[in-house]
Amino acid sequence: MTQDEMKKAAGWAALKYVEKGSIVGVGTGSTVNHFIDALGTMSEEIKGAVSSSVASTEKLEALGIKIFDCNEVASLDIYVDGADEINADREMIKGGGAALTREKIVAAIADKFICIVDGTKAVDVLGTFPLPVEVIPMARSYVARQLVKLGGDPCYREGVITDNGNVILDVYGMKITNPKQLEDQINAIPGVVTVGLFAHRGADVVITGTPEGAKIEE
């Protein structure tokens, strides 16, 4: 089974958590695209979706799924999204696709965060995948200097502007042994919009695509 087939297995397995008549929180990325395809088979049975990115919105709308603005929805039953890395405590690095801030907002209003990944994303310690930080453009150099003080090696992701009009610094060389503490430290830097650590709001359910099919941990 290829990596993409494992992603597909995870994405389709998440469909069992979708309730008829509900509004579904939808993330961003290659694994989520498979979930969106699966969700399309229920387009007549759900109210719609809250999307974390322009890319996902376009894909959902193409399948006839109504999009709700985050401000129209008080809460969501579920939020389905992928991760770049996930540890045993279900803390994650996200934001490889530059949608981390909107992903964090949609995750915050969801009762249940369902993380869909392939088996390559599980790690003992977060940080091998560079940690994305969304930054207001005028603060880029200042934030980078502060990230160096925290032990990181920040790299400006050239040519990328987020859906919010900001820039991304990818922080290399961090072994993140206390994700919640680091999430707080980075979010406290003036000019940071948010960091791609999902530690305070980790996953409630992890669905991993494996060569044998989808493995669900609740």
UniProtKB/Swiss-Prot annotation:
Lineage: Bacteria, Pseudomonadati, Pseudomonadota, Gammaproteobacteria, Vibrionales
E.C. number(s) listed in UniProt: 5.3.1.6
UniProt cross-references to HAMAP family, sorted A to Z: Rib_5P_isom_A (MF_00170)
An individual GO BP term: pentose-phosphate shunt, non-oxidative branch
PANTHER family named among the record's database cross-references: RIBOSE-5-PHOSPHATE ISOMERASE
Name the UniProt record assigns to this protein: Ribose-5-phosphate isomerase A
Record-stated family: Belongs to the ribose 5-phosphate isomerase family.
Catalytic activity entry: aldehydo-D-ribose 5-phosphate = D-ribulose 5-phosphate
Function: Catalyzes the reversible conversion of ribose-5-phosphate to ribulose 5-phosphate.
Alphabetized Pfam families for the sequence: Rib_5-P_isom_A
Gene3D superfamilies per UniProt: 3.30.70.260, 3.40.50.1360
Quaternary assembly: Homodimer.
Keywords: Isomerase
InterPro entries: NagB/RpiA_transferase-like, Ribose5P_isomerase_typA_subgr, Ribose5P_isomerase_type_A
Pathway in which this enzyme or protein is active: Carbohydrate degradation; pentose phosphate pathway; D-ribose 5-phosphate from D-ribulose 5-phosphate (non-oxidative stage): step 1/1
Sample GO molecular function, one term: ribose-5-phosphate isomerase activity
UniProt cross-references to CDD domains, sorted A to Z: RPI_A (cd01398)
CC annotations in GO: cytosol
Binding of substrate, residues: K7, T28, G29, S30, T31, D81, G82, A83, D84, K94, G95, G96, G97, K121
Active site: E103
Statement: the UniProt record of this protein carries the keyword Cell membrane: no
